[in-house]
Swiss-Prot record:
Superkingdom field: Eukaryota
Protein's UniProt keywords contain Cell inner membrane: no
BTB domain residues: 26-121
Keyword Aminoacyl-tRNA synthetase belongs to the record: no
The protein's name: BTB/POZ domain-containing protein YLR108C
Native source species: Saccharomyces cerevisiae (strain ATCC 204508 / S288c)
Further comment found in the protein's record: Present with 189 molecules/cell in log phase SD medium.
InterPro entries from the UniProt entry: BTB/POZ_dom (IPR000210), SKP1/BTB/POZ_sf (IPR011333)
UniProt keywords, alphabetically: Nucleus
GO cellular component, one term: nucleus
Gene3D superfamilies: Potassium Channel Kv1.1, Chain A
Protein location: Nucleus
């Protein structure tokens, strides 16, 4: 660099491209902002053709080229021309360097910046230099940062191909109004670290993952458990219903052996069948068994083979599982009730409000797309009035509780049907045997606080199979569940 006098030529627009290079041994003067640079032809040729080689090929070598750009950014460009790798510090420097690399038409530097090993962003006022290698796994690749970069580069390519005058359409430095603390946790998890996270923090991180489109990491944070069922010889996945991804839900078609066998298990929980009465335990007498020593109560048969005669829904967690597992979904809502019909010996689950909306949102598509029998959940919908006399939509679905680990009012209940059949059970419940004509009958209604279910289909019908449930029967029992602050 020097202060030698010479003709100063100011260029602020793009020059025509020429493949000619400059003499390697010549020194050329370039003033960027308030700083004068003396640069050899060999250095300018290192990323040619470019703005400088085009200019000095048409002007005297003693001409001083003046460009009104940032000298600080040009120092990084100058070091790149000298062969050094650019060390970019933050999102502002990255954006400015990319803008000037385009302005000076430096093809190698533009390519290097596009393929740089880091994303630069600012989360809630804190700058982050994020290694792209953290997003190598399927489901994390097409994330927020990759999408923004791709859109920006595509706009620049359109601008270059159309040879439009002026500056390229660059996005401003990346600023995201999210929590930097949560983002640090995300980077730690992507890097393979194990963090002790509370339920509340996990829920917050899941929301952050959705914002940044880190789909695989989101699924890794979702609470789920894979268990092996030795009775069915199948693996099962336990997961909250609101964490289920619709695209991972499938219905496994039954084999001809299972679909053709309309045994007690098939009809065990269907409305209006004798098999239902036996399987649910509503109707058992000594004459049923006779004197046959080999007689096995119907409830036992159901426990072993009910699922084999229903197409149970399966679930494969996106980006995590390679195969589907039998789905056991958990309902946290208390907007669910089990209705035991004493007269018709039926069991139904009544889902209302958010629980009904959630159930329909997760399963309506897969049930309608069933290749054997399309099932429309609207056929299970009824309009009922709540305690404030407001009309709301309910989903009322046939259910089976014969294999359920059931808790009623805080106590284990081994035989719920003995309570229903008791002469003291004279409560009035909704008769759900015909949803088009609703009446009330004697029975028992239990409100669910927490429950786990399987969903099965067969011949165009659906059934909810209770796996585990905690219930309460009335206001006093509900009050017992309320904890002090």
């Amino acid at each position: 660099m020097s202060g030698q006098k010479g003709e100063i030529v100011v260029y602020t627009k793009e020059l025509e491209t020429t493949p000619e290079l400059l003499p390697n041994h010549e020194v050329f003067k370039i003033r960027i902002g308030q700083k004068l640079f003396e640069i050899s032809g060999a250095t300018l040729n290192s990323d040619a053709p470019n703005f400088f080689t085009q200019f000095f090929n048409t002007h005297d070598k003693n001409t001083i080229l003046f460009v009104d750009r940032s000298e600080d950014v040009f120092i990084i460009i100058y070091r790149h021309l000298q062969g050094y790798f650019p060390d970019i510090k933050n999102e502002v420097q990255f954006t400015c360097l990319f803008a000037d690399a385009l302005y000076f038409q430096l093809p190698k530097l533009v390519k290097l910046i596009k393929e740089y090993d880091y994303h630069f962003t600012n989360i809630g006022g804190v700058p982050f230099k994020v290694p792209k290698s953290l997003f190598h796994e399927e489901g994390n690749r097409l994330n927020y940062f990759e999408t923004i970069s791709r859109i920006s580069y595509e706009e620049i390519e359109k601008w270059e191909s159309n040879k439009k005058p002026g500056f390229p359409p660059l996005l401003p430095p990346s600023y995201i109004a999210r929590s930097p603390e949560f983002f640090r946790d995300i980077l730690s998890l992507l890097g393979g670290s194990k963090l002790e996270l509370s339920e509340e923090r996990t829920a917050s991180l899941i929301k952050e993952c959705r914002y940044y489109r880190l789909n695989r990491l989101e699924q890794e944070l979702v609470r789920a458990k894979i268990i092996y069922n030795p009775l069915t010889n199948c693996q099962e996945v336990c997961i909250a219903l609101d964490s289920v991804s619709k695209k991972g839900v499938t219905i496994e078609r039954l084999t001809s052996l299972h679909t053709g066998n309309q045994s007690l298990a098939v009809s065990s929980c269907l409305n209006g069948t004798e098999g239902e009465k036996a399987a649910t335990g509503f109707h058992k007498t000594e004459t049923d068994s006779g004197n046959n020593d080999e007689y096995e109560p119907p409830t036992k048969k159901v426990k072993h083979c009910i699922e084999r005669h229903w197409s149970m829904l399966k679930y494969q967690r996106p980006y995590i599982d390679t195969v589907s597992h039998d789905l056991i979904f958990q309902l946290h809502s208390n907007q669910c009730k089990i209705i035991f019909n004493k007269k018709n010996k039926t069991v139904h689950v009544d889902l209302s409000r958010e629980a009904a909306v959630l159930f329909e949102n997760k399963f309506s598509d897969v049930l309608l797309e069933n290749p054997d029998f399309k099932i429309d959940l609207s056929e299970y919908k009824v309009k009922l009035r709540d305690s404030q006399m407001q009309v709301e939509s309910h989903l009322i679905i046939p259910a089976c509780v014969s294999i359920c680990d059931l808790t009623v009012n805080g106590a284990k209940c081994c035989n719920i049907f003995s309570l229903v059949n008791d002469s003291k059970c004279k409560g009035r419940v909704l008769d759900c045997t015909n949803l088009k004509v609703l009446n009330c009958v004697h029975g028992l209604k239990l409100h669910l606080s927490k429950s786990m279910w399987k969903l099965g289909t067969n011949n165009g019908r659906i059934i909810l199979v209770a796996v585990k449930a905690e219930t309460f029967s009335g206001t006093k029992e509900y009050c017992k569940m309320i904890d002090f602050l």
